[in-house]
Amino acid sequence: AERLCGGGAGLAGTGSARATWLVDMPAGDAVRLSCAMMQQSDLGSHHLHFAPKRVTIGVGCARNCPPEELTELVRTALNEAGVCDAAVHSINTISLKADEPAILELAQHLNVPLRLFSAKELEAEASRLATPSDVVFAEVGCHGVSEGAALAQLGSEGKLWLQKRKTANATVALGLTDRPLTDLRGAARGRLSVVGIGPGQ
């Protein structure tokens, strides 16, 4: 409301230098705007937090991995990196896991898109992996699922930020890019629609 009434805003936070779309905003003390990927607390009623979506999450898991195991692993990784949920752009994995309940629940939990990549697309990232695995290659056709998926969503401008972390049944890796991500690479999960059923349909 203060801003709509003509009050100026002050920028702060580690991402403020990249927030070039805000340079024309009138400066002032009516509103404080923090631009950072880290969680902000005790902001007050005149303090807004904007988290640029610069982080991609790559995940992999065993078939029928307990959803809570994957979610807890991802939460631990985000806390380790100091990233708030709002800075997450997407969940990414191999196409073989399109129907994996733990991954579907994770995307719903974080309220971000789930994107799928073929083994060939993930193998294209092999040279950038921190922990390539011949065992994984023998099983699914690429040398890394979580790291490869995080990188595949970023494209060539991004980098691996947090290399693979794992539990007994799940893996996670984080990717990072300098600029907020606005597009989605990879494929969305397919849907089946029944158009008609019965005699004459």
What are these model-predicted stretches?
Residues 1-24, 130-186:
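N-terminal glycine-rich phosphate/adenylate-binding segment common to multiple enzyme folds
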Residues 78-83, 188-201:
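Glycine-rich, flexible N-terminal cofactor/catalytic loop recognition
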Residues 92, 115, 193-195:
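Hydrophobic/aromatic beta-strand patches that form the interior of the parallel beta-sheet core
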Residues 1-97, 175, 181:
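Conserved mixed alpha/beta catalytic, RNA-binding, or beta-rich assembly cores of soluble enzyme
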Residues 56, 159, 191-194:
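Residue-level preference for the first positions of well-ordered beta-strands
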Residues 94, 101-145:
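Long, charge-dense
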Residues 71, 75, 104, 145-149:
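Predominant activation on well-ordered alpha-helical scaffold segments within soluble catalytic domains
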